[in-house]
């Protein structure tokens, strides 16, 4: 896992360079990001996100943060008049593409997983959907998530993971051959989608991700596979009593 922070695609890069390259990926794909997600996953990412939103179980008065929230898919599923929902993302372009000109009940704020513009222990629930594999330093990000969560607060992390063995050859062939072509045709940036695929390939599997969370002192850690493990939702709590 530590290696993820030093790679971009198949290249070894220094962490600051990786950060800049990841930013440039999302800057370039922002206007086609939602369309590409629908095409690449046949719309199934929407079902995964609905399941994530259901697990959030929002309550009146809560502060819910959607970290790496991008165009705000998840934030829109959990927003409501009786709670505050904030998207935090370093890409102004992604947030602009999602915000459009519509008024919504979502607040948008620039920030990274490694450094969020929030005081300690203020967040009831933090979601991160297809964002954690983009962060440059996952341990720092998990420590930062811990910092902003209230005691008893929960992290819900939806991410691509390792599918069941019989599915893997088909999944890898699809990722390797189909997605970069779609990226070229639709998003006009095949290299950006090459990075996305490579970052999925290098990301820890379900059990390793669970161990990373436990190593950062999260408790009650469990996960739920979606679509035979193509995606996975990890749920983890900051210990303490929810106030
Ligand atoms: C694959 S998109 C996911 C967007 C959205 N959450 C979704 O599920 O559709 C990844 C997002 O992570 C953001 N990102 C990249 N590096 C980040 C970092 N260090 N901290 C937080 N977000 C980051 C990108 O700007 C991008 O919006």
Model regions: which residues?
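A short acidic, Gly/Pro-enriched loop at the edge of an enzyme's catalytic core
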Residues: 114-125
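A short glycine-rich, Lys/Arg-flanked "PGG" loop and its adjoining helix->strand segment in the class I
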Residues: 139-154
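Conserved class I S-adenosyl-L-methionine
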Residues: 154-183
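N-terminal auxiliary segments of SAM/dcSAM-dependent transferases
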Residues: 1-24
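A short SAM/SAH-binding and catalytic strip from SAM-dependent methyltransferases
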Residues: 124-138
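Conserved alpha-helix/loop element of class I SAM-dependent methyltransferases that forms part
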Residues: 28, 32-35, 41-62
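Class I SAM-dependent methyltransferase SAM/SAH-binding core
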Residues: 63-116
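Core SAM-dependent methyltransferase catalytic element
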Residues: 217-243
């Amino acid at each position: 896992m530590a290696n993820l922070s030093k790679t971009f695609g198949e290249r070894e890069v220094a962490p600051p360079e990786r950060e800049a390259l990841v930013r440039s990926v999302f800057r370039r794909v922002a206007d086609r990001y939602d369309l590409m997600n629908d095409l690449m996953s046949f719309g199934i990412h929407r079902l995964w996100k609905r399941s994530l939103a259901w697990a959030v179980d929002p309550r009146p008065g809560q502060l819910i943060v959607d970290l790496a929230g991008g165009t705000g898919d998840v934030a829109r599923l959990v927003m409501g008049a009786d709670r505050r929902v904030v998207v935090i993302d370093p890409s102004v372009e992604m947030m602009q593409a999602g915000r459009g000109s519509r008024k919504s009940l979502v607040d948008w704020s620039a920030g990274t997983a490694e450094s969020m513009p929030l005081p300690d222990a203020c967040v009831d629930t933090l979601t991160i959907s297809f964002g954690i594999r983009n962060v440059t330093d996952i341990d720092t990000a998990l420590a930062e998530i811990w910092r902003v969560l209230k005691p008893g607060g929960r992290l819900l992390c939806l991410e691509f993971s390792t599918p069941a063995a019989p599915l893997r050859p088909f999944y890898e062939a699809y990722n390797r051959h189909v997605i970069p072509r779609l990226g070229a045709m639709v998003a006009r940036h095949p290299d950006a989608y090459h990075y996305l695929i490579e970052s999925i390939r290098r990301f820890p599997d379900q059990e390793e991700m669970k161990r990373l969370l436990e190593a950062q002192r999260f408790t009650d850690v469990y996960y739920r596979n979606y679509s035979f493990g193509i995606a996975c939702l990890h749920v983890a709590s900051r210990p303490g009593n929810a106030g």
